[in-house]
C-alpha cells in the first residue's frame, strides 16, 4: 500500500499518455524526449568505455573527468567558478539532484516555494522530504508568461526555507529575465532562503527571445553561497535515457546533497560519465546546431497550431509550446488531451498536470513537445488537421 503522502503521485500522466500513444499508434508530442541521437563523438566514447570495462561503480561524487568538465563548462559559459572536488556532484539525472537537494538541505515541516505550473517531480519530492509545497503562479504577459515578484515576496512566511526556480521553464517555455532573476536573488538574500535552480534546458534558449542567453542565479550577488545549481546531459545532448545530471554549489551545500544522494542511488551511469565529459568539453558547436534546429521545429509547430485555430503562447526556450484550444471549442484541456489521441492520433499533456490539484487556473492550456524529427512533426501536424 502506498503511503498517504505519495498516493496523489502514484501514476504520472506522462507515463499514461506515452503508454496510450504507443498502444494506439499516436504521435507522442506529450513526453519531452527527442527521437534523434546525440553527437557521434560522445556516443563513441560511451561505446568504447563499455568495451573497455568501465562497467562497475564509479566514484561516489562522479568520475574526476566529468566533474572537471562540468566545472569548466560553468566557467566557460557563465563565468561561475566551482571546485570540481568539493562543489560538483554527479547525480542520476537532474530529477535525483533535485530530490537529494530537498531531502538533504531542507528540514521537514519547512515550506518550499515553487512557481506554478511546475515540473511534476517537485511536489512528490517535497512530500517525501516531509516539507510543505507553496505555489506562486506565473502570470500572463502578452503572448507569454512572467513572474509576479510581489506574489513571490508575499508567499515568503516564517516557515519558508527554500524555493525551486526553473528557467528555462518547463512547461511554459518561459525564460526568466535578468530583472526577474535579480528580484529573486534580492528576495532570497533578504529572507535567507536556499534556492535550488533547475537549469536542465540551459542550452535551449532561442535566439529570437528577448534574453538570448541563459543566466544562472548563482551569478547574482549573495547567491553563490545559497544556490544549488542543477543541470544534466539529457536535454543538452539528446540522451534522456542516460540519466547523467549534476549539482553545483558551495561545499557545505553539496555535502548535504551528497549525504542524501548516496543513499538514493549511490552512483550511476559509469560508461556514460566519460562520454558526457567528452561532450561538455568538445560539443558546444553540436549543441548550437541542436538549438537552431529546435527553434525551427518550434516555429513549424507554432505556425501549424495557430493556423488550426489554437492560441499559441511564445516559447523562449525548452522543448515545449503551450497552446489554448478554447477557440476550437475545447474549454477543459484534460478532456481535450484524453480525447486527442483517439480523435487525431496525437498525444499532448494538459497543463493541469503541472499544477496544484485544486487549481483550475491553467486547465485551458495544453503542452506540446516539438523535440521530434521533422517527419514526425509533419505527421503530427497532418493528423491534427482533423480538428478544423
Question: Language model features by range: what are they?
Answer:
Residues 2-93, 100, 151, 279-282:
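N-terminal small-domain helix-loop-helix segment of the aminotransferase-like
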Residues 24, 129, 190-191, 308, ...:
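Helix C-cap/helix->beta junction micro-motif
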Residues 102-126:
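Conserved PLP-anchoring active-site segment centered on the Schiff-base-forming lysine
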Residues 110, 131, 190-193, 223-225:
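A short helix->loop->beta-strand "cap" motif at the edges of active sites that frequently abuts
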Residues 138-211:
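Active-site phosphate-binding strand-loop segment of PLP-dependent enzymes
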Residues 153-154, 339-348, 354-388:
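PLP-dependent enzyme catalytic core of the Aspartate aminotransferase-like
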Residues 224-295, 302, 308, 388:
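Conserved core segment of the aminotransferase class I/II
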Residues 277, 294-302, 312-325:
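Conserved glycine-rich beta-strand-loop-beta hairpin in the small C-terminal domain of fold type I
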Amino acid at each position: 500500500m502506498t503511503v498517504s503522502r505519495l498516493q496523489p503521485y502514484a501514476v504520472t500522466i506522462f507515463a499514461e499518455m506515452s503508454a496510450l500513444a504507443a498502444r494506439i499508434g499516436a504521435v507522442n508530442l506529450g513526453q519531452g524526449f527527442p527521437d534523434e541521437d546525440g553527437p557521434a563523438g560522445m556516443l563513441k566514447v560511451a561505446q568504447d568505455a563499455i568495451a573497455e570495462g568501465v562497467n562497475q561503480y564509479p566514484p561516489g561524487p562522479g568520475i574526476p573527468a566529468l566533474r572537471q568538465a562540468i566545472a569548466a563548462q560553468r566557467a566557460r559559459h557563465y563565468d561561475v567558478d566551482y571546485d570540481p572536488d568539493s562543489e560538483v556532484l554527479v547525480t542520476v539525472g537532474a530529477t535525483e539532484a533535485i530530490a537529494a537537494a530537498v531531502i538533504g538541505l531542507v528540514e521537514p515541516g519547512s515550506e518550499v516555494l515553487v512557481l506554478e505550473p511546475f515540473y511534476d517531480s517537485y511536489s512528490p519530492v517535497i512530500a517525501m522530504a516531509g516539507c510543505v509545497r507553496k505555489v506562486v503562479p506565473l502570470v500572463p504577459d502578452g503572448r507569454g508568461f512572467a513572474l509576479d515578484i510581489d506574489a513571490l515576496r508575499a508567499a515568503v512566511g516564517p516557515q519558508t526555507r527554500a524555493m525551486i526556480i526553473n528557467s528555462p521553464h518547463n512547461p511554459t517555455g518561459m525564460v526568466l529575465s535578468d530583472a526577474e532573476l535579480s528580484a529573486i536573488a534580492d528576495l532570497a538574500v533578504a529572507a535567507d532562503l536556499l534556492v535550488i535552480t533547475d537549469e536542465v534546458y540551459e542550452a535551449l534558449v532561442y535566439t529570437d527571445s528577448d534574453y538570448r542567453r541563459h543566466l544562472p542565479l548563482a551569478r547574482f550577488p549573495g547567491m553563490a553561497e545559497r544556490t544549488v545549481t542543477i543541470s544534466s546531459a539529457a536535454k543538452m545532448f539528446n540522451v534522456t535515457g542516460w540519466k547523467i545530471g549534476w549539482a553545483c554549489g558551495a561545499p557545505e551545500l553539496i555535502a548535504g546533497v551528497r549525504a542524501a544522494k548516496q543513499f538514493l542511488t549511490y552512483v550511476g551511469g559509469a560508461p556514460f560519465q566519460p562520454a558526457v565529459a567528452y561532450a561538455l568539453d568538445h560539443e558546444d558547436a553540436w549543441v548550437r546546431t541542436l538549438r537552431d534546429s529546435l527553434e525551427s521545429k518550434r516555429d513549424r509547430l507554432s505556425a501549424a497550431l495557430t493556423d488550426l485555430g489554437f492560441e499559441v503562447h511564445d516559447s523562449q526556450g525548452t522543448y515545449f509550446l503551450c497552446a489554448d484550444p478554447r477557440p476550437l471549442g475545447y474549454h477543459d484541456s484534460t478532456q481535450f488531451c484524453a480525447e486527442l489521441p483517439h480523435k487525431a492520433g496525437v498525444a499532448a499533456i494538459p497543463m493541469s498536470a503541472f499544477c496544484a490539484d485544486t487549481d483550475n487556473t491553467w486547465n485551458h492550456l495544453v503542452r506540446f513537445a516539438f523535440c521530434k524529427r521533422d517527419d514526425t512533426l509533419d505527421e503530427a501536424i497532418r493528423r491534427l488537421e482533423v480538428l478544423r
